[in-house]
């Protein structure tokens, strides 16, 4: 039981660290983002959305699976929360004057990542 609690804490910490990273990367100016991540190839932005949202989903879903035998209720809220967070961040980008803009394809990439993370959390067994 102690190792399960430790694993739950690990997934929770990694998930919140990832959510913090998503928020920072989403809310810094376009110029600062380009200096921070100088990679310039087609769709690097979408790949980032898939990977970061996928990892957050994986971490929180893994945590929910470890905490409860009936994790489907929690997982629905995790998925909904991450989708909502992505939409709110896109709206903030649209309303801000930081050189960032709303992109529906970012929301699609977020959703793909979230559902991939959820699926992997189910398919990959815990220790």
Predicted regions and their residues:
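Small-polar-interrupted transmembrane alpha-helices in polytopic inner-membrane proteins
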Residues: 15-26, 74-95, 111
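Interfacial helix-loop-helix junctions of multi-pass membrane proteins
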Residues: 34-36, 87-112
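Membrane-interfacial alpha-helical segments at the cytosolic side of multi-pass membrane proteins
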Residues: 52-67, 112-125
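Residue-level marker of motif borders
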Residues: 40, 44, 81, 85, ...
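Short helix-capping/hinge motifs at transmembrane helix termini and TM-loop junctions
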Residues: 28-29, 65, 97, 125
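"…centered on the first transmembrane helix and the immediately adjacent amphipathic helix/loop
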Residues: 1-63, 78
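Extended, folded domain segments that form the structural surfaces/walls around functional sites
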Residues: 81-85, 105, 122-127
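Membrane-helix interface segments
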Residues: 9-10, 70-77, 100-104
């Amino acid at each position: 039981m102690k190792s399960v609690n430790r694993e739950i804490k690990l997934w929770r910490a990694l998930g919140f660290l990832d959510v913090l990273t998503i928020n920072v990367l989403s809310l810094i100016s376009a110029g600062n983002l380009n200096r921070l991540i100088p990679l310039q190839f087609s769709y690097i932005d979408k790949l980032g959305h898939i990977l970061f949202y996928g990892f957050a989903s994986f971490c929180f879903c893994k945590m929910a699976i470890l905490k409860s035998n009936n994790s489907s209720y929690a997982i629905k809220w995790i998925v909904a929360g991450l989708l909502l967070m992505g939409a709110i961040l896109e709206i903030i980008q649209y309303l801000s004057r930081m050189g960032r803009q709303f992109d529906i394809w970012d929301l699609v990439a977020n959703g793909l990542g979230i559902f991939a993370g959820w699926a992997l959390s189910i398919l990959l067994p815990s220790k």
